[in-house]
Amino acid sequence: MNYINMNILLLLCLSFISSSYISLHFDTLIGNLTSSNIKNILPYNYIYTSICVGSPSQCFNLNIELQNPLLSIIGSSYNSSSYPKYDSSKSSTYKEGEYKTFKRSEPAPLEGEIVIFNFAGYESTDTLTIADKTISNISFINVDKNFISDNLKENSGILGLDLRLSEGVSKEMMLINQLKKNNVIDDDVFYIEYKDEHKGNLIIGEYPHKVSSSFKEENAKETYAYTFLNEVFWGINFNSIKLNNSEIEYDFKVSMFSIESGFILAPNPVLTQLNKTFFKDYIEKGFCKEEAGDFESFSCEDTNNVNFESFPTLSFYHKEINMTFSFDYSDLFYKFEGRRYCLIFGNYDPFLDTYWILGKPFFIKYKTFFRPDSKRIGFYEIEPSKPFNFWWILLLVASLIIIGLLIYIVVFVLTKKRKKRAIELDDDYEYIPKLNV
């Protein structure tokens, strides 16, 4: 009986160890498998990412096609965690289910237009009255209400809203108040304005955190600068969107960045062609003036002659884990068909491991982590694609089986020897009769 119990116990221990290993590496294995599957669906000139609110069942997919000279995007509000299928034989106007197709037009002026992701059923309109003043050129992109549950407070997430107002920051404040008044956004959302002189790029999200200790209180109130305690922000901002029958023409950018002590570590990467003095523009807006020095301005056409090694490496310190991270500005650029494009890149998150995007083919896997305030936030981590090989999984399973058999054989042999020895000792035992005294 003891022999059977011992073997069962050992097998249970082995099963526990095996299952623990597989559980720890399950996301990697599945990520590799997913990457392999997606590779057959999406060519290498695609970026696939998502905005998620609360869970994988509430995501807005962005499937960005890097196609010269056009950039195309396919977005869908979907109710399952499966990847949407893409038919490469069809054009960029391909639609399936709830797919909405956006087609890029020529870049429009940076100021004077407003684009809003309409999550609350706000009626589409070309104008919006703010403080008794009508602002035109407003486009609302309607998204199914199922995309966000009725109780926004129960689902964490970050929503992107890009404002391009020629009037400046003060009018952005009016717009936010108007949107709250019309229940387009919740009263508890927060927003970030980089600098007073900077127009646009206003990020909408949830759960305002305390202002970083390095902010002066009056400065924080003046610039409305909040921090997520060094965690990753990201927003998807659309500029110059115009309704055109069933299609929407656009010029867009995607940003993913982190904030430390009020310093914007990563300028918003622009997915369209760099046709302006990118770094100089951001430095003059106060992004990196003190920390990074004065960069030489350049345009997209002459980036091939730029010595990226001359740019300093930006470092930032994470208080909670007592570590310093850094990145180089050259990581922002990806050379595609002889031209440089500035791509979305992953900053870092200590809870999700450090990751970077360096212009390689990359795909995604779903991640969930908990904020310091215990609010869950889910999103798709963008990661370099990894070749998936079925034989690695087979080898892993075979190795575990072989190890289990070896342990079983060793235990079986030792137990058998022990029983044999016990029998021999029992045979050598002589009965000594009890003497009556």
Where is each model-derived feature located?
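Cleavable N-terminal signal peptides of Sec/SRP-targeted secreted and luminal proteins
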Residues: I4-S20
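A residue-level signal for conserved active-site and pocket-lining positions in enzyme catalytic cores
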Residues: E65, L128, L159-G160, D196, ...
